[in-house]
Amino acid sequence: MDVAPNWYLALSAVLFTIGTFGVLFRRNAIVVLMSVELMLNAVNLTLVTFSQSMGDPSGQLLVFFSIAVAAAEAAVGLAIVIAIFRSQVTVDITEINLFKH
């Protein structure tokens, strides 16, 4: 059973939209970081879909590098959130003021 590429692209658009709303409307820094990761995975799904439909594996290779960069970004982002939490005792983006000290 083959699934049409349009379904994958629709799923990617839904995931990207959910991630965008998470970045725009959430205040928790960890949830915002997770929303950015969701957006990156939506882009990866789009790359794999177009790569598969065109028959060119270079898009899938680009996704492997993108996953590695996303993992590093998540690790650095989480480390920054933990450091801010230790100094500010909050992960609420509206309450964090790094220029205060």
From Swiss-Prot:
The keyword Membrane applies. Gene3D superfamilies: 1.10.287.3510. It is an enzyme of class 7 (translocase). Coiled coil: none annotated. Its main location: membrane. It is found in: Cell inner membrane. Its EC number is 7.1.1.-. The chain crosses the membrane at residues 5-25, 30-50, 62-82. It is a multi-pass membrane protein. GO terms for biological process: ATP synthesis coupled electron transport. GO terms for cellular component: NADH dehydrogenase complex; plasma membrane. It catalyses: a quinone + NADH + 5 H(+)(in) = a quinol + NAD(+) + 4 H(+)(out). InterPro entries: NADH_UbQ_OxRdtase_chain4L/K, NUOK/Mnh_C1-like. NDH-1 shuttles electrons from NADH, via FMN and iron-sulfur (Fe-S) centers, to quinones in the respiratory chain. The immediate electron acceptor for the enzyme in this species is believed to be a menaquinone. Couples the redox reaction to proton translocation (for every two electrons transferred, four hydrogen ions are translocated across the cytoplasmic membrane), and thus conserves the redox energy in a proton gradient. NDH-1 is composed of 14 different subunits. Subunits NuoA, H, J, K, L, M, N constitute the membrane sector of the complex. Belongs to the complex I subunit 4L family. HAMAP family: NDH1_NuoK (MF_01456). This is NADH-quinone oxidoreductase subunit K. It comes from Salinibacter ruber (strain DSM 13855 / M31). The gene is nuoK.
